[in-house]
Amino acid sequence: MFVSYRWLQEYVDIKDVTAQELADKITKSGIEVEGVEVLNKGVKGVVVGHVLECEKHPEADKLSKCLIDIGEEEPVQIICGAANIAKGLKVPVAKVGAVLPGNFKIKKAKLRGEASHGMVCALQELGIDGKLVSKEYADGIFIFPSDAEVGADALEILNLHDEVLELGLTPNRADCLNMLGVAYEVAAIYGREVKLPAIDLQETAEKTSDYISVSVEAKEENPLYIAKMVKNVKIGPSPMWMQTRLMAAGIRPISNVVDITNYILMEYGQPLHAFDYDKLGSKEIVVRLAKEGEKIETLDDQERTLQSHHLVITNGTKALAVAGVMGGADSEVTNETVNVLIESAYFAGQTVRRTSKDLGLRSESSARFEKGIDPTRTFEAIQHAAALMAKYAGGEALEGVVEADNLQVQERTVSVTAEKVNRVLGTNISASEMGTMFTNLKFPFTEVEGTFHVNVPARRPDITISEDLVEEVGRLYGYDHIPVTLPSGTMTRGKLTAAQTKRRKVRRFLEGAGLYEAITYSLTSADKAKQYMVEPNEKAPVNLALPMSEERSQLRLSLVPQLLEAVSYNVARKNDSVALYEVGSIFLPTEAGELPKEEQHLAGVMTGLALHHAWQGEKKVVDFFVVKGVLEGLFDVLGVSNQITYAPAKREGMHPGRTADIVLDGEVIGFIGQLHPEAEKQLDVKNTFVFELSLVKVFGTDAEETYYSAIPRFPSMTRDMAVVVTKETKAGEMKQVIAEAGGELLKDVTLFDLYEGEKMEEGKKSLAFSMNYFDPERTLTDEEVTEAHNRVLTAVEEKFGAELRK
């Protein structure tokens, strides 16, 4: 927000405060002033000149020889190259000795043999940004109104002795996106009064309602719409003071009618729009939602395709403007416009924001509607605009307005105690001082025994709770005045929760196993949201109300899809060996209207080589057992390995023969496996394995305690066993049966071979186990080991129908 220091003085008396002092004070009150710009940029010696004579240069067709009165004893001759120079004009003249931006000094010169005693200036040459110069003067010199005094300071007329404060407003302070809002802020800081604009509106006997009717179909999106007629306007330039104020605010002057709507926007923060009444095509205004695919050509000469949630202003059939964003070219005010219909409305910020984003079209008006405007200024703004059009465009303001008013402006009362204010701020401000601050803020209030009941004006939508009032007191008191104190109270030593400790263990182990941590988006697209879920969920994923894109429109139900995107991205860039893991949240949908259930999961993906450096030995490709080994090591670290089993599973998107559920105490908590070949093809990856499991359920299980034992002094005995079983037999279940049957002497069971070759019967396979027997107190005898081993053989024969392989 650019704030003209001189313009601001019209609303609050700050003549005793310099612009820099004001900037410092505003910054200390909580609104950052990013800079103060002096508009004249060091320019000196530029005056108003009157062109007495103008003729072609005898030696150059594109130059003119001018005799110009600059308010001195004798007129001066100046050679000018501007195409729009002419006799009788009043123009800015840089005299000999004048200084222009960049410390450029004007000297006497000869141009093609003719003397030149000065320079006729364009606005750009006086330091004004070319983007802010009206089209009329974009390629030529500036021309003053005919009543400009010859010899007067041109910079004063152009308001270039002004200073502009640039405010860096946060989204909650939309009330300062206009001059009156800033005036209220400055008045509160200095304890002064705000002088509101005087509206001198003379209306004709004719009524606006005789020319136009207004109806609103989309009442929720447009609760208030006001229209007013101004007839017989004469389009021309706006007054100089208005043009200079608009340029200081960063707005290019266009014409008197358009400039007035922009001026009101900057003064009140109320966006207005002016229609050429004679181009409307009907005598009615209908505000409705657009039809899907409806077309409109906007003021920037672009054809826009509308969607059904966009709000439009129509003549009953055809769209005339995109509400709150931009007007239509068909009803644009031009030099031929005679009758003007002014619009002042309150459009829902959410609707305007979505429309603006969809169309890729952002304007000063849309920015203010998005952040929220003061609905109580809507009528005052349109009346002031009509008065200015009557005065500066020669128009006739018709009596009254036509409105569709469904707006319910509810009074907000927020209460706070003086005790709370002082407790939160660490101050000792009296209740009377606080009352003075609320008075300076123009917040009506009542006080009962130290409790303030504050009626918050509509211009301050950011004040909703007592803490907001505490902030207002703190801002006006001055944060730099709050006394410095040491921390008080009991110091509590921080520590990690059990879940935090376990998460650190997970990260430490997986990184030690060669996986890199990834952090992916919690948002995903509709087609990926339900992929690779640990538990099937029939409810629809949670949708964002206003997603930035379709790719990030739903909350994820699995971590795997985003990790696969990361793998695909790496593989496409020739990084073929990737091992990633993520600890993150998924969002399980609940009943309609309730918040989703957030649950912490662990997921990982591995592809390419597991070992690929020479010092690690032979290269090893990632397979099911490599990934399973990583998980088994993790479960050992977490103390739940004896409670974990694996069960073959068929899951969508996973390889049907290389996928298993991870089961904890009989409950499926995750899965592990290889991607389905079709999924690998879509991602353009090969040999890719994934896993995902619920950390909530793992952490919620009591971990086995870790015991330490002395290094054994007695030897152990090893027996191997190869048995033939059906292909459906699970090695993990057999290993568990062997461990139970072997008793206390059997300390370790390892599967070291799986054979399914030509020599095996159809439907059979061979499993080979190595069993280690040991007693820490003595040396075992062969008979003791044989007895335990026979129990193992008997158990697997009875349980699985196993036969010793011969």
Curated annotation (Swiss-Prot):
Domain B5: from-to ranges: 409-484
Assembly: Tetramer of two alpha and two beta subunits.
Cofactors named for this entry: Mg(2+)
UniProt organism field: Bacillus anthracis
Domain FDX-ACB: 712-805
Class of this enzyme: ligase
Enzyme Commission designation: 6.1.1.20
Binding locations of Mg(2+): D462, D468, E471, E472
Domain tRNA-binding intervals: 40-155
Name of the protein in question: Phenylalanine--tRNA ligase beta subunit
Family: Belongs to the phenylalanyl-tRNA synthetase beta subunit family. Type 1 subfamily.
Single GO molecular function: magnesium ion binding
A Pfam family this chain is assigned to: B5
Subcellular location: Cytoplasm
Alphabetized UniProt keyword annotations: Aminoacyl-tRNA synthetase, ATP-binding, Cytoplasm, Ligase, Magnesium, Metal-binding, Nucleotide-binding, Protein biosynthesis, RNA-binding, tRNA-binding
Catalytic activity: tRNA(Phe) + L-phenylalanine + ATP = L-phenylalanyl-tRNA(Phe) + AMP + diphosphate + H(+)
